[in-house]
Design a protein with these regions (language model features):
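Short coil/turn segments at beta-strand junctions that form active-site/ligand-binding loops
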Residues: 1, 33, 104-106, 130
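N-terminal subdomain of nucleotide-sugar transferases
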Residues: 1-64
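Hydrophobic/aromatic beta-strand patches that form the interior of the parallel beta-sheet core
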Residues: 4, 36-38, 69, 109, ...
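A short, structure-level motif marking secondary-structure boundaries and short turns
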Residues: 9-11, 81, 105-107
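Short glycine-/acidic-enriched loop or helix-start segments at secondary-structure transitions
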Residues: 15-16, 47-48, 80, 118-121
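A conserved catalytic-core segment of Leloir-type glycosyltransferases
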Residues: 39-99
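An aromatic- and histidine-rich active-site surface loop
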Residues: 84-99, 105-128, 134-137
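Short gly/pro/ser/thr-enriched loop/turn and capping motifs at secondary-structure boundaries
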Residues: 139-141
């Protein structure tokens, strides 16, 4: 099965959503599934890119056989409603644009607490006519 997972956070970020998603996807790969992550370049919580990363339109990375596509977003520190919302909405649009080109997907998963990842994942599932899973771990804001 090919799982497309939409998440705003993924390692090397060390927050709970990033670690949780990594642990889930690593187990799915160990069990023979193909996993593609669409996320942004690591910058949480300070809004500064981690060393070795750029905020480019698309960057491919593989960690433990997990396919990771990092997409361009508006990057800001984790403070202030307006800037954070622009960051989240920019990720939603970027993940939709690049998610459309992910081939042969069997299921699309979107994770909270970032609300706009859910919209992106739902939209991609509808376009691809595959099941949508909403992983609710935290209610935002």
């Amino acid at each position: 099965m090919h799982i497309l997972f939409i998440t705003d956070n993924f390692p090397p970020e060390g927050n709970a959503p990033a670690i949780r998603t990594y642990e889930h996807t690593r187990e799915w790969v160990k069990n023979g599934h193909t996993v593609t992550i669409i996320t942004c370049s690591p910058n949480f919580p300070d809004g500064k890119l981690f060393d070795g990363y750029k905020n480019k339109w698309i960057q491919r990375e593989i960690i433990d056989d997990i396919n990771i596509w990092r997409v361009k977003t508006f990057i800001t520190a984790n403070e202030g409603f307006f800037k954070r919302t622009i960051d989240y909405v920019s990720f939603m649009f970027s993940s939709i644009i690049f998610g459309v080109f992910t081939k042969k997907v069997d299921v699309v998963i979107g994770t909270s607490p970032q609300f706009f990842t859910i919209i992106s994942a739902w939209f991609l599932a509808k376009i691809k006519r595959v099941p949508f899973i909403f992983e609710l771990r935290d209610i935002w804001p």
